């Protein structure tokens, strides 16, 4: 069973529906016992980094996630991926879950082409930089769906894939059993 971690933000039910379409049993939960009993974890998210970390902390889920990710696969999606990093500079400086070495920074100031819109919203080609089982069903250059204004930076050792948005934008990361995708896999494929 997959536990979709519910901390009050995110695309929880569209994600659960996508997993059901793939024949995967999933439950949306904030219950630590259910999270501990799950085989795999997904940390979704839409919104601001600081608010999301505050909600995870207030619900007592930070230590549960950190402990369980040592034993089973964890996938962070969009903001969920960003939360995997050491810190973020979204509306101040905030500590993250610390699985991925690096930081989450605003996309706009780093863009080489200042005419590009932020947030990056829409389809972009994914370029695989490290082979990984995560890409078993994703081909090099396949288009994936993004909606974000911040991105993972200074994380080369964990970066699995990037997309070009006048700069290489981190598309997927991995550290041990912990994976993250900045793009939305539940909106990107069949």
Where are these regions (language model features)?
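Short acidic/histidine-rich motifs immediately flanking catalytic phosphotransfer sites
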Residues: 36-45
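Cysteine-nucleophile active-site neighborhood
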Residues: 47-122
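N-terminal beta1-alpha1 ligand-phosphate binding loop
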Residues: 2-24, 183-187
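Short gly/ser/thr-rich secondary-structure transition/capping motifs
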Residues: 21-28, 56-59, 125-129, 162-164
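Short acidic low-complexity segments
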Residues: 26-37
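Amide-donor transfer/coupling interface in amidating biosynthetic enzymes
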Residues: 70, 103-190
